[in-house]
Swiss-Prot record:
Coiled coil: none annotated. (6S)-5,6,7,8-tetrahydrofolate binds at residues 121, 125-127, 355-357. Catalyzes the reversible interconversion of serine and glycine with tetrahydrofolate (THF) serving as the one-carbon carrier. This reaction serves as the major source of one-carbon groups required for the biosynthesis of purines, thymidylate, methionine, and other important biomolecules. Also exhibits THF-independent aldolase activity toward beta-hydroxyamino acids, producing glycine and aldehydes, via a retro-aldol mechanism. GO terms for biological process: glycine biosynthetic process from serine; tetrahydrofolate interconversion. The gene is glyA. This is Serine hydroxymethyltransferase. It comes from the Bacteria. Its main location: cytoplasm. Keywords: Amino-acid biosynthesis, Cytoplasm, One-carbon metabolism, Pyridoxal phosphate, Transferase. Transmembrane segments: none annotated. Its cofactor is pyridoxal 5'-phosphate. GO terms for molecular function: glycine hydroxymethyltransferase activity; pyridoxal phosphate binding. The modification N6-(pyridoxal phosphate)lysine is found at residue 229. It catalyses: (6R)-5,10-methylene-5,6,7,8-tetrahydrofolate + glycine + H2O = (6S)-5,6,7,8-tetrahydrofolate + L-serine.
Amino acid sequence: MLKRDMNIADYDADLWQAMEQEKVRQEEHIELIASENYTSPRVMQAQGSQLTNKYAEGYPGKRYYGGCEHVDIVEQLAIERAKELFGADYANVQPHSGSQANFAVYTALLQPGDTILGMNLAHGGHLTHGSPVNLSGKLYNVIPYGIDETGKIDYNELAELAKEHQPKMIVGGFSAYSGICDWEKMREIADSIGAYLFVDMAHVAGLVAADVYPNPVPHAHIVTTTTHKTLAGPRGGLILAKGGDEDLYKKLNSGVFPGSQGGPLMHVIAGKAVAFKEAMEPEFKTYQQQVAKNAKAMVEVFLARGYNVVSGGTHNHLFLLDLVDKNLTGKEADAALGRANITVNKNSVPNDPKSPFVTSGIRIGSPAVTRRGFKEAEVRELAGWISDILDNITDEGVSERVKKQVLDICARFPVYA
């Protein structure tokens, strides 16, 4: 018989120890991975609820199982809040992840062998935008576009490639691009050849919700996003659209279920509903504004310390440090910073001479540290510590000094107070 006082600690000590150690790691390390964030206890409460028990294949009011009257309310709340938050008139909250959302879009609108244009992974794109190692790159004929010598998207190249290859879809969005995307220009290019414009705004969804970054929803045929990252919700995906094309919406729904998924995760959808409500609060906008300010403040320090920032700056929450001139690899930098309790990720840079497993750069993002309460003063100090380590990458004394500074600032700015 199940009892409400059952717990992991008394039953599975090994698992509980790992979970508790991860809790300590998150509190005692500075998180700078651009795709990571801290979700609220309210979201975690939803994810740990009895909703995890319920199968609900189908959509609200059109389920294949009985007993869905309450989860219908949960999902409809998430749908309506997502539409309001992003100015959409269609939302599908069922995708289990951003990658699943993207695959559902492809499933709904493309046939194997169709041509798509996607941002080159080495220039800041994402695996699911046509990388040859991803299913998207195996199923479709992918033509990559990239950035110019200034580090910005080359729209002239994009237009020329579109005209030459006549793709059925142009994919916008990125995983490591610090500039502003001209969604209107991309739609013009797509319209000129009769292609879909599909935008993956996973990295900037929180900034978009707070009007800190341009919203692609009014311009794209379809928009997807994750619900974590800058949006700070549970790990999951979301599909949005606007324009009233009911035929398109039906195709998208079918692309999710039954096209690429079975039963939705109702406990996660409840977490999404909570996160969307939180994103409508005034303090969320203040938070996102600070995310952008903090990223810019860090860039200023790195430039002053002689580091090469790809694109020369940032207009969102992330940026890349190109370490080629420093004769460092991303792998070395990642490991050295990790020893000082600073977590980043190695990342390829444009024209990277190293393999994706080594790389010549690191990606830095500000959402998580901003969630802790860091402002410009703290992130400038942090950027200085990172520079100290990278300037003296084999000096254990510098590493130990910075680690103590990190532990001190983490204690002053806890994740969960």
